[in-house]
């Protein structure tokens, strides 16, 4: 768990972090970073490739990327197989969201490559724009909370997900398929998105990304700001998207326990570098990962 001490509260006072787990000790963000760096080990390319099932569907090699002239990711590698899920965890400022931003085209890439597609169908998408990555490469980015258009109806929000389609009728057709899939949204199709509950808004955000029928979902903090019952609902939806609909998922998740329980593969980032990589359940059982990121 990453919780900062506040005010004059004694360091031994029990506290509850964002994982809803009690802990007898509070570790500052600075200490998490320091201790995580001590745990960091050089993760070889053989380890990275071994965790991906079959030919990698998403492959990042030697990526140096950031914002403006500031480099956040340093020689970063990643591989995930088709229909697999990968969760990125780590201290604040480790570069987790920057990985998603880089895949989707929101960063400056100084060197390295990003490819999508398996085997002979692999395509270099490093220099494509976000619109090209959505329309041509089948990559959708599901932003953090509060990305719906509150004054628009649920139905209109879904139509917006198809803004790159050649014909508006195609977006409307896809919206109807989504309403059939998620009756909870269908019941609210004519209501302003601003009146939805937190869980319903997240469902709408995910559904809007599905309008373009992407192959790869980049999911940024799916549990942030949600009550526990809605968190479970969102991860059930993501589970079905992976295992029933065949989507490949790369996510950043502040609730490291929930993210590692969900994902096939887990990566720990520290200071813009890959510090640890293993199967999600293996990292979940790692006592050092538990101490720093899972609340004990």
Across the structure, where does each feature detected by a protein language model lie?
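ABC-type ATPase nucleotide-binding domains, specifically the catalytic core motifs of the NBD
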Residues: 50, 68, 108, 154-173, ...
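ABC ATPase NBD Q-loop/coupling interface
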Residues: 113-134
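ABC-family P-loop ATPase nucleotide-binding domain
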Residues: 1-64
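Helical segment within the ABC ATPase nucleotide-binding domain
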Residues: 231-246
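Conserved ABC ATPase signature
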Residues: 192-196
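The feature captures the beta-strand-to-loop junction immediately N-terminal to the Walker
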Residues: 89-91
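Helix-to-loop junction immediately C-terminal to a conserved catalytic motif
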Residues: 104
């Amino acid at each position: 768990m990453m919780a900062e001490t506040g005010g004059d509260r004694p360091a031994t006072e029990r506290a509850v972090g964002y994982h809803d787990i009690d802990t007898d000790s509070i570790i500052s963000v600075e200490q998490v970073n320091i201790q995580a760096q001590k745990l960091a080990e050089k993760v070889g390319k053989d380890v990275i490739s071994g965790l991906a099932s079959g030919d990698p569907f998403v492959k990042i090699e030697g990526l140096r990327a950031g914002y403006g002239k500031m480099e956040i990711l340093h020689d970063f590698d990643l591989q995930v197989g088709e229909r697999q899920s990968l969760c990125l965890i780590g201290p604040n400022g480790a570069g987790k969201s920057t990985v998603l931003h880089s895949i989707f085209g929101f960063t400056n890439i100084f060197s390295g490559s990003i490819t999508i597609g398996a085997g002979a169908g692999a395509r270099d998408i490093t220099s494509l724009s976000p619109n090209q990555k959505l329309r041509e490469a089948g990559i959708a980015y599901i932003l953090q909370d509060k990305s719906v258009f509150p004054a628009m109806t649920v139905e209109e929000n879904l139509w917006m997900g198809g803004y790159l389609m050649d014909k508006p009728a195609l977006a409307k057709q896809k919206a109807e398929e989504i309403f059939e899939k998620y009756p909870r949204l269908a019941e609210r199709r004519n209501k302003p998105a601003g009146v939805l509950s937190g869980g319903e808004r997240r469902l709408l955000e995910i559904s809007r990304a599905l309008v373009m029928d992407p192959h790869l979902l980049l999911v940024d903090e799916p549990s942030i700001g949600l009550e526990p019952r809605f968190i479970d609902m969102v991860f059930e939806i993501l589970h079905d998207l992976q295992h029933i609909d065949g989507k490949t998922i790369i996510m950043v998740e502040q609730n490291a326990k929930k993210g590692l329980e969900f994902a096939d593969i887990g990566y720990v980032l520290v200071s813009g570098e890959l510090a640890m990589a293993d199967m999600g359940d293996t990292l979940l059982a790692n006592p050092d990962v538990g101490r720093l990121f899972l609340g004990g």
